[in-house]
């Protein structure tokens, strides 16, 4: 079983890093101004999506598993008007991904099935469920980011 746990943790941690690398590749050609531009009257900007994914990981993994004491302000993830520089937003995102990947790689088989508790995630009974749920969430928003980058950079 230890080999399976090591394979699972290695693969899952690498997946988070692939999401990070993909996002970096997609947002590389856009400016800070474009990061905060929403090309539609609905939805979110790339910047707000990155704040949201960062907050999600810092809360559900950082605060709930690592014990970072991160306090999430979810509404602000979608309404922040500070328009921080792209590099700062990406650095915060990278730190969250690094924290998650490091945490996952430290998990034993027993750790993966350790109880996980968050009132907003009742269908995540253990850490493995939380790690996979947050990976799916990050990938979902990666798709939205890819779409928005394509919209913001397409030729008229």
Predicted segments with their positions:
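Generic structural signal for secondary-structure transition and capping sites
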Residues: 21, 32-35, 58, 98, ...
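Short, contiguous alpha-helical
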Residues: 2, 9, 13-17, 24, ...
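Acidic/histidine-rich alpha-helical segments that form the ligand environment
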Residues: 81-115, 129-137
């Amino acid at each position: 079983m230890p080999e399976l746990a090591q394979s699972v943790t290695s693969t899952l941690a690498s997946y988070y890093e692939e999401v990070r690398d993909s996002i970096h590749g997609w947002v590389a050609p856009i400016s800070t101004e474009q990061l905060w531009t929403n090309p539609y009257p609905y939805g979110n900007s790339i910047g707000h999506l990155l704040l949201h994914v960062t907050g999600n990981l810092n809360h559900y993994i950082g605060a709930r598993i690592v014990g970072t004491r991160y306090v999430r302000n979810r509404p602000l993830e979608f309404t922040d008007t500070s328009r921080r520089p792209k590099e700062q937003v990406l650095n915060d995102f990278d730190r969250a991904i690094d924290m998650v990947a490091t945490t996952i790689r430290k998990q034993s088989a027993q750790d993966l099935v350790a109880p996980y508790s968050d009132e907003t995630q009742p269908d995540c009974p253990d850490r493995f469920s939380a790690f996979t749920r947050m990976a799916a969430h990050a990938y979902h928003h990666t798709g939205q980011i890819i779409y928005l980058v394509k919209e913001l950079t397409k030729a008229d």
